[in-house]
Amino acid sequence: MQITFLGTSSGVPTRSRNVSSIALRLPQRAELWLFDCGEGTQHQFLRSDLKVSQLSRIFITHMHGDHVFGLMGLLASCGLGGNVKSVTLYGPPALEDYLQAGLRYSQTHLAYPIKVHKSKPGVIYEDDEYVVSCAYLKHRVTAFGYRVTEKDRPGHFNVEKAKALGIPPGPIYRKLKQGEFVTLPDGRKINGADLCGAPHVGRKFVYCTDTVFCDGAVELSQGADLLVHEATFSHQDAEMAFQRLHSTSTMAAQVALAAGVKHLMMTHFSPRYAPGNSVLLDDLLQEARAIFPNTDMAYDFLSYEIPRWNEVSQLLAKARS
């Protein structure tokens, strides 16, 4: 699981930051999921090493323009030359009307099917490898945070141990690799888990924007390996954050701390903190780190491989022993 930030500014783009969009790459299945699609997102694709042909799902947090104005252009371009097979979208109730109106009035005809699902709190998508759930956030319009959970996978299968038990290679190995019980022709019952190493614990990625500090964000983020949370304002502008229902850097850090996440990545920054102003983005970073030390600040085209923190901890423990 790797994320790439395609836009990290709030409201309007700047010379160095486009508006909101994050790509989640699932390389083992050559698939790409997009979270929000602000204006110019397709241009950001062209400036990155992402392949639009791998786009399969788009998750929209809310219907403000800096999160959706890039949708029509991206979907139209996918149809012209992206070789996209189909795209499934998830978002607020107004998303489908917005797309249908755009397609109708621009007389755009997509060369591939799209499906639009209305997001509701709870699980909105699940397959053999991943579960996607969402929760309400607290903003001026209906807004959702999204959580992607990678399912646990069995550990390394010990072929030599299986052979030593007299288990011949064949289709039965597939069940054993999945940690299942199997019955051998001689009547012996074998627990596949006994032939596998420690399981690979699934990673958890959470994306929360736009929102002021709220219980929904804390609950959705519980135990996340990576929380990407908006930090539109500095702590000194907290009054403005409450008025506009956005988060400060300290609110993002408080969510991370309360939810027990491993790593916080802040995004969605107001242009008011650009170089030359009295408060800079580095000040927001220091504010957050005072509460939650493992905090970083996103920037456009930053790619980040979400680590398996339990395996990192095991390696560190071995190195220290």
UniProtKB/Swiss-Prot annotation:
The protein's name in its UniProt record: Ribonuclease Z
Active site (catalytic residues): D66 (proton acceptor)
Subunit structure and binding partners: Homodimer.
Pfam families: Lactamase_B, Lactamase_B_2
Binding site for Zn(2+) 1: H62, H64, H139, D210
Family: Belongs to the RNase Z family.
Entry function: Zinc phosphodiesterase, which displays some tRNA 3'-processing endonuclease activity. Probably involved in tRNA maturation, by removing a 3'-trailer from precursor tRNA.
Species annotation: Trichodesmium erythraeum (strain IMS101)
Top EC class of this enzyme: hydrolase
Enzyme Commission number(s) from the entry: 3.1.26.11
Binding positions (Zn(2+) 2): D66, H67, D210, H268
Superkingdom, taxonomy of origin: Bacteria
Cofactor annotation remark: Binds 2 Zn(2+) ions.
GO MF terms held by the record: 3'-tRNA processing endoribonuclease activity; zinc ion binding
